[in-house]
């Protein structure tokens, strides 16, 4: 390879998004909107329960033309979002590396590293062992061909998504635009002494919804927090574990392990009507209720200054997931319109099922 394409000029064929199996329709709708905003012309392909969605442009499009449309943080239902540039079919069982290397060479693009992935489905996970074994041989073959320069900062990462044993999609993960976790799934450790599995959801929310620098600056030991709908204490435990003092609001009981920390005040009250005597740093909420009611309550807390930051969960109706999310966005927008600019981030987490998790704060 004597000539190499600048990353912005890499000819791409569309967008590749990873999602939870069963949420392809929702991600497809989001990719349609994102592509339209970016001025891309093409179509979506989404197979039910496949765990991924393809947006394919009618003409090759320079990577630079995608702009911020490839930012994985934008679509709610995407775990990962990448511009893809090639699909390699009919991979021979004894030599999968050569066709992939040839496709990468044909693109003219160098990469800083390579990540082999599968969709998050039971069928695809059977190839995860192969991906681990094949990563090093493929990396060596790419390096030998001049396609890999691990010492070059700023180059994209080559993502190879095996949707079957014989088909691989090749995509370019740009620094700062794509998720750095394999398959877009952060590895969250489930502590053995946590009162419920929901603690892992809040831990993932901190990882997914807050930037690394933010986690250190706005989530600190010694802060005060409120947990609405706290029982049995999974989210409260996560906050306490990070050094926050928590007022837990729930008519139900909290686990003894939560109360034993001596950093929790448990008040038996209704999460919708209770208010703190003075502002707190954080409010979190995982109450089972209509998403519109939760969104309105969260916006009210932020608008009135009762909390600076909030992370909350929205339970979605099965057949109108996208519409429910947009309704909540609009409710929050209307309530905060007269207050000032705000930052709302919503993601369908790995630990979410028929729900999404959101972060909200006023911009300061």
Swiss-Prot record:
Cellular-component GO terms for this entry: cytoplasm
A molecular-function term among this protein's GO annotations: S-adenosylmethionine-dependent methyltransferase activity
Primary residence: cytoplasm
Disulfide bonds: none
A Pfam family recorded for this sequence: FtsJ
Cellular location(s): Cytoplasm
GO biological process: methylation; rRNA processing
Name used for this protein in its record: Ribosomal RNA large subunit methyltransferase M
Record text on subunit structure and interactions: Monomer.
Stored PANTHER family: RIBOSOMAL RNA LARGE SUBUNIT METHYLTRANSFERASE M (PTHR37524), RIBOSOMAL RNA METHYLTRANSFERASE FTSJ DOMAIN-CONTAINING PROTEIN (PTHR37524:SF2)
Listed InterPro entries: RlmM_FDX, RlmM_THUMP-like, RNA_MeTrfase_FtsJ_dom, rRNA_MeTrfase_M, SAM-dependent_MTases_sf
Sequence similarity: Belongs to the class I-like SAM-binding methyltransferase superfamily. RNA methyltransferase RlmE family. RlmM subfamily.
Reactions catalysed: cytidine(2498) in 23S rRNA + S-adenosyl-L-methionine = 2'-O-methylcytidine(2498) in 23S rRNA + S-adenosyl-L-homocysteine + H(+)
List of catalytic residues: 315 (proton acceptor)
Top-level taxon of origin: Bacteria
Function as written in the Swiss-Prot or TrEMBL entry: Catalyzes the 2'-O-methylation at nucleotide C2498 in 23S rRNA.
Keyword DNA damage: no
Record's keyword terms, sorted: Cytoplasm, Methyltransferase, rRNA processing, S-adenosyl-L-methionine, Transferase
Sequence positions that bind S-adenosyl-L-methionine: 198, 231-234, 250, 270, 286
Protein EC: 2.1.1.186
């Amino acid at each position: 390879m004597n000539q190499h394409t600048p990353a912005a000029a890499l000819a791409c064929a569309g967008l590749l998004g990873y999602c939870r199996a069963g949420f392809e329709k929702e991600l497809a709708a989001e990719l349609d909107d994102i592509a339209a905003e970016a001025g891309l012309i093409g179509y979506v392909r989404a197979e039910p329960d496949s765990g991924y969605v393809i947006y394919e442009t009618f003409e090759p499009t320079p990577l630079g033309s995608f702009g911020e449309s490839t930012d994985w943080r934008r679509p709610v239902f995407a775990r990962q979002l990448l511009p893809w540039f090639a699909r390699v079919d009919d991979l021979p069982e004894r030599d999968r590396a050569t066709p992939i290397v040839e496709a990468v060479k044909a693109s003219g693009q160098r990469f800083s590293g390579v990540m082999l992935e599968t969709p998050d489905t039971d069928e695809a996970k059977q190839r995860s062992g192969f991906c681990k074994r094949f990563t090093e041989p493929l990396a060596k073959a790419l390096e030998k061909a001049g396609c890999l320069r691990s010492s070059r900062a700023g180059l994209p990462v080559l993502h190879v998504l095996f949707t079957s044993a014989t088909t691989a999609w090749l995509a370019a993960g740009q620094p700062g635009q794509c998720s750095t976790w394999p398959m877009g799934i952060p590895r969250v450790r489930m502590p053995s002494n946590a009162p419920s599995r929901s603690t892992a959801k809040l831990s993932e929310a901190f990882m997914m919804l807050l930037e690394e620098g933010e986690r250190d600056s706005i989530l600190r030991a010694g802060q005060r927090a409120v947990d609405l709908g706290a029982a049995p204490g999974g989210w409260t435990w996560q906050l306490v574990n990070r050094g926050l003092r928590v007022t837990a609001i729930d008519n139900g009981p909290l686990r003894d392990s939560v109360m034993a920390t001596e950093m929790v005040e448990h008040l038996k009250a209704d999460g919708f009507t209770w208010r703190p005597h003075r502002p707190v740093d954080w409010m979190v909420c995982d109450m089972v209720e209509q998403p519109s009611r939760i969104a309105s309550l969260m916006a009210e807390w932020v608008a009135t200054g009762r909390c600076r930051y909030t992370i909350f969960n929205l339970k979605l109706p099965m057949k109108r997931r996208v519409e429910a999310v947009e309704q909540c966005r609009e409710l929050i927008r209307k309530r905060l319109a007269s207050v000032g600019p705000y930052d709302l981030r919503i993601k369908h987490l790995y630990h979410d099922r028929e729900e999404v998790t959101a972060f909200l704060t006023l911009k300061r």
